[in-house]
Every structure is written in C-alpha cells, then in structure tokens.
C-alpha cells in the first residue's frame, strides 16, 4: 500500500493540482462504473456505515468507538468491520488479542478493545463470518464508496479544519467523491473539530442532520514535563492541536505517513530528538499499538468523542424499521 502525507496542494490549489486534474476524471469514471454494474448485497443485520468523502483523518475511528459504546449500553449485539489498513491481511479475520497491527491493521487492534471486530481488505469476504457471529448491527468503518453492500444508515465524517480541501478528486485533491453527493445521501453528518465558529457555509444546507463533535483528551498526563510529539495518522495537525488544548508543553514534533509501520531506526531517532530537547515522547493510540517493546518509554494520548446533539444520533440509530 502506498503511504502518503497530505500534500499542501490538496488543501489549496496550485499548478500541481491542475496538472493532475485530468486523472481525477478517470478516478471519477471508474467509481461511476462500479456503482452502475454492481448489485449491492443485503447483509443479515442492520448496517451502519461510517465513512468520509475525503482522504485523511476525519475522526471516523472515534465515531465508531462512540457507536460501539452506545450499543453496549443498550445490550445490542454488534460487530465492527474495519478495512485493515497497513496490514498484510489476505482474508477476512475475526480480530483476536494476540493479533498484531501488521496482521490486521492498527485500527482493527484499537477497535477490538470496544467490541468484536472483523478485519478485511475485501468487504465481500465478511459474509461467512457475519453468518457465524449473527450480530443485530454491523458497524462498518470506511467502505462508504464501496457499492458491494447495502447500507441502512450512513454517517459521513468531515474534519472542520480541512473540510473538503481544494475540492478536487484524487489525485488532484483529497476527495474520494464530491461532497454534495455524499452529504445528500447521508443520514448523519459529523463535523469533527473545535465547535467555535458555527456551521461552515458548505454544510449549512445539511444542518438538520449535522452533529458537531470534538475529539478531547481522555488521558491523565503530567503537564509539568516537556513533550516531543510524533504521529503517523491521516490528520496529525488535529493531534497536535489536541495536545495544545490539553495544556501540554510540546517542544517539537515529527510527522510520518498515515498508517506508518515504525522501524527500530525511527524509534532510536525519535528517542534522540526527545533527549536533545529534554522531553518525553508522546504519540497517538494508533501509533502506540505499533511500537512494541519501546512503548514503555513513550506516553500515549487517548482521546474520546464529545458530541453536541446525542438525541439526533439516538433517533437515527434506534428508530424503528
């Protein structure tokens, strides 16, 4: 899998974006063909699909965790299906405690703490496992643009800071599909980020299904130390902002590609940077689960989702069919 940082021209158009724009037509046409010629499979449970219309971190994982914890409070049997990013997975697998991130992906390992998880790179492979587990609800993390299965409820996550970038499709921009299509079809839209500033103009027409959410720290971390932050996630800027809002003194940071698998050399270099700055290393849970033996010298920032309108979410999730 190719791992990329979020290029600057994805946020603000420049000559590179315009050069790549014709290739975006090909991407759009291939997506159109998939939807035209595929008949969706109806899974034997209610399907809640959480996705986004752009590349990069938009808070999907935290939304899935929130949903999982919500369903637990209602004693509803559920299964989480994840995309196994960054893994060498060949077949759909029920995630076990002994699985590594290389085997099933970082998100799968994290979400397995919140419920039963099926990791897969091919949504068509999950059907036998779904029949085996017999859940009442299936939470699908990502696969929003995948036409191979029917979705009962769709939730689109939007990052407040990046929104829809430069408005171009991949590779000229960050979009997997144009927002008007995704948002119009969605049952709920999560706007993830600092709630100040109101609703962006681009989302105003979707206010009746909009939930504003913030990702807040849930860890108890010593604020009297210096920290050197690093991450290999889709939206590292939001991680660094969360650290700042938590009141930590960040003396430096390093960004790695999304879903990056750390080498021993990386960890040694990070340790040297931290030592030089008289600081302690700090990272995200997604990065922390991939570090292995070095995790005892690194602080992990855990986060949770806080939403402004839980009643709207409950109404959509628990409405009678």
UniProtKB/Swiss-Prot annotation:
Keywords: ATP-binding, Kinase, Lipid A biosynthesis, Lipid biosynthesis, Lipid metabolism, Nucleotide-binding, Transferase
Reactions performed catalytically: a lipid A disaccharide + ATP = a lipid IVA + ADP + H(+)
Known EC number: 2.7.1.130
Binding site for ATP: 54-61
Molecular function GO labels: ATP binding; tetraacyldisaccharide 4'-kinase activity
Record-level GO BP terms: lipid A biosynthetic process; lipopolysaccharide core region biosynthetic process
Function: Transfers the gamma-phosphate of ATP to the 4'-position of a tetraacyldisaccharide 1-phosphate intermediate (termed DS-1-P) to form tetraacyldisaccharide 1,4'-bis-phosphate (lipid IVA).
PANTHER family referenced in this protein's UniProt entry, alphabetically: TETRAACYLDISACCHARIDE 4'-KINASE, TETRAACYLDISACCHARIDE 4'-KINASE, MITOCHONDRIAL-RELATED
Name of the protein in its database record: Tetraacyldisaccharide 4'-kinase
UniProt organism field: Rickettsia bellii (strain OSU 85-389)
